[in-house]
Amino acid sequence: MIALKHLAHWDVEPARAARARYRSGDVEPTSGVAPGFTQANMIVLPRDWAFDFLLYAQRNPKACPVLDVSDPGSHLTELAKGADLRTDLPLYRIWRDGKLAEETPDATAAWAEHPDLVSFLIGCSFTFETPMVEAGIEIRHMTDKSNVPMYLTNQPCRPAGRLHGNMVVSMRPIPASRVADAATISGRFPAVHGAPVHVGAPEQIGIVDLAKPQFGDPVRIEPGEVPVFWACGVTPQAAVMASGVPFAITHAPGHMFITDILDSAYHA
């Protein structure tokens, strides 16, 4: 887990306002929402699976960088005082025996099924999109107001306990002349996936068709652009599926938890 640095007082109203909207039932992808505030993926597991996942994350830090872990039975996080992890994400997924059972904007009922749930908040690449935009690099899914495309690769994660699975990556088309800049900017945020894991040649990592992402929405790739791939916090959901985890709650891909922590806190 990454220790936060230079924490100070700042206006967290944009993050709180977004969470309040989601608590009231608004559903939307969170890319570009509350810019400047760190966003997080989430996976929630019964206590008897929590150590397996913590070890899985430790062994696969590029895809699963842990930002916070709750106490068993708690729906709170130190990353946003007063937030409720059961209601404050725009959309949740409920998993049973490794299969997606439902999507819901409120996970309170599912949460009540297990009194000892442990929540993990995982770094999200949306965090470094703001500095990329500020550097003049277009983020296509933000321009098109769609969800980021995410793909299941053929790259195995290192297993841990009962958990195994392949890495999931997110993709952003980047002009060939700006790929190095995108890698440099994102590389300054190792706690939220950091630099890309692959550039170009999607077939080399098992992606057959960029127009058919397993998660999220396809995006345009214009002439002169290169598909650039980052490790993605949906990787835990791939492990849930591959490992047949009996019960889990996760964020829906692209629908993150918005923290009160500034992006700059995770700048290396």
Curated annotation (Swiss-Prot):
It comes from the Bacteria. Its EC number is 4.2.1.-. Keywords: Lyase. One of its GO terms (molecular function) is lyase activity. Pfam families: D-Glu_cyclase. PANTHER family: D-GLUTAMATE CYCLASE, MITOCHONDRIAL (PTHR32022:SF10). HAMAP family: Hydro_lyase. Belongs to the D-glutamate cyclase family. This is Putative hydro-lyase Avi_5849.
